[in-house]
């Protein structure tokens, strides 16, 4: 919905923020990655029973308006699991620039198993690798541009304080006056500067 709204506007670039994102569903990571990757691999899975699976971009999900604009993905040491699938897919397919810190390094794919008591337990069933075959487990994904992570409270405050209009204002401002907390959030500021410079 957000990308559809953006497609009707003239934009300079896109910034995705998965800092402090512990992950989520594998299918969701694949869906989101496919919105930015026209063709190519998203992730490969190696199951503990010895089988392998290569998951490609889903046809029809790609947004054509993203083709010629810079895309930035903000990451930090708390970006894990499904958010790392997105990071690995965007990095290996060379469609986005990663800014921030090396990610957490959790490459386990888990699924729930029902217990006879009525509860459930989540157990790992596979390990995932990036499109280029990189094993990021306990290693993480290094950003293209490394920027020290600001305090978590600053990141949280920034995310809850900046509206869409204010973020756009940050892109086009010609003054040195800080806009909200952007100047304190070095990773976000670096991403904005990168977009303004045309992705250079």
Task: Place the predicted regions along the sequence by residue.
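C-terminal "post-core" interaction segments
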Residues: 1-200
């Amino acid at each position: 919905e957000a990308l559809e709204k953006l497609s009707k506007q003239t934009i300079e670039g896109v910034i995705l923020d998965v800092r402090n994102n512990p992950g989520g569903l594998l299918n969701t990571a694949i869906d989101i990655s496919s919105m930015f990757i026209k063709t190519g691999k998203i992730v490969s899975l190696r199951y503990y029973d010895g089988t392998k699976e290569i998951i490609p971009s889903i046809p029809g999900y790609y947004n054509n308006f993203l083709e010629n604009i810079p895309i930035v993905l903000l990451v930090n040491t708390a970006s894990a699991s499904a958010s790392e699938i997105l990071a690995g897919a965007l990095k290996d397919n060379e469609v986005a620039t990663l800014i921030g810190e090396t990610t957490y390094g959790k490459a386990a794919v888990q699924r729930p198993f029902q217990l006879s008591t009525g509860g459930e337990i989540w157990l790992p069933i596979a390990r995932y690798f990036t499109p280029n075959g990189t094993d990021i487990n306990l290693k993480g994904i290094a950003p293209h541009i490394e920027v020290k992570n600001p305090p978590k409270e600053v990141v949280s405050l920034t995310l809850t304080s900046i509206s869409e209009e204010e973020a756009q204002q940050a892109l086009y401002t010609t003054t040195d006056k800080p806009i909200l907390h952007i100047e304190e959030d070095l990773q976000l500021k670096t991403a904005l500067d990168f977009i303004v410079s045309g992705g250079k």
